Design a protein with these regions (language model features):
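An anion-engaging/catalytic patch
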Residues: 1-123
Length: 125
């Protein structure tokens, strides 16, 4: 199985992932990610694990991320930081989630230059 890096989204100078991107990468559903977040909400810190985007900032984001249909009609949006993606991997606790998280850290969150073409990874499955 090949993993393709998600579309790069940056908010306030921080690379983030949408709930849909995390779910797709970790091989689960968006609903499972949302459930785990609400179930463990006390462990997530706004600004550290996730960023809430609303108002004019969200409108600007929608204009720059035209491929992200998952939040086209959202009034507010939670975007997950590297540390938030870690908490989701911990909640899921699957081999795939851990493998993908490690890959995202190396090639998505900490990548310094823009990629000209998608980067893919072979997974064990």
């Amino acid at each position: 199985m090949q993993l393709q890096l998600p579309e790069v989204i940056e908010v306030r100078g921080i690379r983030v992932l949408t709930t849909r991107q995390i779910a797709d990468a970790y091989g689960t559903t968006k609903d499972k990610i949302i459930y785990n977040f609400h179930y463990n909400k006390g462990r997530y810190v706004l600004g550290k694990h996730y960023i809430e985007v609303a108002g004019e900032e969200l409108r600007r984001l929608k204009r720059t991320c035209e491929n992200q249909m998952s939040f086209k009609y959202a009034k507010s949006l939670y975007l997950w930081t590297e540390k938030g993606a870690l908490l989701h991997a911990k909640s899921l606790n699957t081999d795939k989630a851990w493998e993908v998280y490690d890959y995202l850290v190396d090639f998505y969150f900490r990548a310094k230059d823009e990629r000209k073409s998608p980067v893919t990874m072979e997974t064990k499955e």
